Amino acid sequence: VLSIMGCSSVFLVESNKKKCRFLSEVVRATNCSAVVHNGRIETYNDARDFDYIIARALAPLDRLLKLSFSLDRGQARCLFLKGRNYEQELIQAKKKWNMDVQIHKSLSFTLSSSAEKEFRGVVLEITNLRLKGG
């Protein structure tokens, strides 16, 4: 979506080959400039500068921070979609990490039985990521 909207450099890492084929087909069909890398983020080691690191349903926050930090040493702006337990994950992560965090309500909602919108999650916007004591 970011590449379709005009972002000039989008790099996607996906370990599932079937999803990679789908993403590659979308890139081809929409003539956008995204690059799809089939592999695990834990083993990705190509030197790049990232402006943003975005993840959804990948890992607990503490692990996401570790992965992000290994990619760019805390320089990128991280956008992580998290569910109901985000507060506990944030408390746990702050034991190891210093960071600036903004919490944005997710626009993803479901209708409850009372037909009212039910909260489903947040987007954690994290900058200035640093390992405590490091």
Regions found by a protein language model. Name each.
Residues 6-7, 11-133:
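S-adenosylmethionine
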